[in-house]
Design a protein with these regions (language model features):
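A short, N-terminal amphipathic alpha-helix
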Residues: 1-15
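Acidic donor-binding segment of Leloir-type glycosyltransferases
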Residues: 13-37
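Short, high-confidence coil segments that cap the C-terminus of an alpha-helix
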Residues: 15, 63, 89-93
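Short phosphate-binding loop-to-helix
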Residues: 32-65
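The conserved acidic donor/metal-binding loop of glycosyltransferases
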Residues: 70-74
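Conserved donor-nucleotide/metal-binding helix-loop-beta segment in metal-dependent transferases, i.e.
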Residues: 76-101
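Short, glycine-/small-residue-rich phosphate/pyrophosphate-handling segment
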Residues: 109-131
Length: 188
């Protein structure tokens, strides 16, 4: 999935400077292959800790905005990134929820530390509340490619039902997951 996300962002004609927070060898190679800056996370602080670390790096460098994209949204498309930037306020945020409305699958903030990001189960409502509490505009966009994150077996079936041939879809089809039994779901 990470490969699909990084490749989609790299192919985006309006791509700004991009960073990948990781110390994973496979992810490091992808970052190099697609010319992403690497922000090492040797302590592996988890998603929220990695984003806080990257936010601090951006503040130190005087970066104007951040767009945080997770690695588990293989259907992301450049047109959706265009929509985020088209709606981005001069000061404020844009949030794109997961399809179930519980998780946050894209978070644009200007300035970069406008409000803290806290990922995990049910992150969307807290992110929306934090964004609104700043008094700055907060735009919520429903973006179908970004909305489908893969958190559980049911999401794999949803991914397979979409047209297209991302690397992830191709791999799932090779694995022939049509017989996979879905017994429950986890949080986004």
């Amino acid at each position: 999935m990470l490969h699909d996300v990084v490749a989609a962002i790299a192919a985006w004609p309006r791509r700004p400077a991009c960073s990948l927070v990781t110390s994973d060898p496979f992810a490091l190679e992808l970052a190099r292959q697609y010319d992403f800056e690497i922000i090492p996370d040797p302590a592996n602080p988890g998603e929220t800790g990695a984003i806080e670390m990257a936010t601090n790096v951006c503040v130190e460098r005087g970066i104007d905005y951040t767009l945080v994209i997770p690695a588990d949204i293989p259907l992301i498309h450049a047109s959706e990134l265009d929509q985020i930037f088209a709606h981005a306020p001069e000061q404020g945020s844009v949030l794109a929820p997961a399809a179930d409305g519980r998780g946050t699958n894209a978070a644009f903030r200007r300035p970069v530390n406008l409000f803290p990001l806290r990922f995990g189960n049910d992150s969307f409502k807290p992110h929306l509340a934090a964004a609104q509490s700043t008094g700055k505009p907060c735009i919520v966009l429903q973006l179908p490619g970004i909305a489908l994150d893969v958190d559980n077996p049911e999401n794999l079936h949803q991914l397979l039902s979409h047209s297209g041939e991302t690397r992830t879809q191709s791999l799932l089809r090779r694995w022939s997951l049509s017989g996979l039994v879905v017994t429950g779901t986890e949080g986004a």
